Amino acid sequence: MIFEKKTHIVEFVRRPNRFQGYVIIDGKEELVHVPNTGRCKEILIPGCRALIREENGQNRKTRFSLIGAYKGKNLINIDSQIPNKVVEEALINKKINGLEKYTKICREKTFGNSRFDFKLEDPLNNEYYLEVKGVTLEENGLCRFPDAPTERGTKHLLELIEVKNNNIGAGVLFLVQLENVKSFSPNDDTDPKFAAALKKAKSSGVDIFVYKCSVSENHIELSQSVELKL
């Protein structure tokens, strides 16, 4: 997907809370919105090059949103609204192995008391529920999720197992929002409950997809699958 709004590279200064950050724009420090509640502490390091996007909402307190940052040569997207858009585009273009047959794509659909990112249907009306998780944590080519404990993420995995137990297709897709990665693993050290739930989901027949992205300062798209190590 191409970013419709104009972007700029600036210097990151600090992040006082989850939703706010400060960057240097035209030699002056300015407040920007951070559309990501994760820690991102390995990415948003004072002095790093950051990617900001121009915004034009009348009720906004800031002119820009901080949507990415460079870690070495890797540009990493941190806009939490982007992964579902990237995956939807990939589903439409049949780029996800194993999900090509699904022709109907619906966002934010429920199964029982659970809400998932996507509900897919094939021409025979067979259903498939897909949850998407954006991945930004990387070290020496190994990506991990989550970067902070996530009860919600664990709950999603257990709910996908319930979907599968009802003989309905279910999967989770980890979208690695950077290039130059070799493999993906659950972050046992940070959230052992999530790691255990992911392994249980795998053994229960829930599909686990891992894809990396092609990322630039004006676009991001799903590119290639990444090795899963459980």
UniProtKB/Swiss-Prot annotation:
InterPro entries, sorted: SfsA, SfsA_C, SfsA_N
Pfam family, one: SfsA_N
GO molecular function list: DNA binding
Gene3D superfamilies to which the protein is assigned, alphabetical: 2.40.50.580, 3.40.1350.60
UniProt-listed HAMAP family: SfsA
Family: Belongs to the SfsA family.
PANTHER family listed in its UniProt record: SUGAR FERMENTATION STIMULATION PROTEIN A
Descriptive protein name: Sugar fermentation stimulation protein homolog
UniProt organism field: Clostridium botulinum (strain Alaska E43 / Type E3)
Lineage, broadest ranks: Bacteria, Bacillati, Bacillota, Clostridia, Eubacteriales
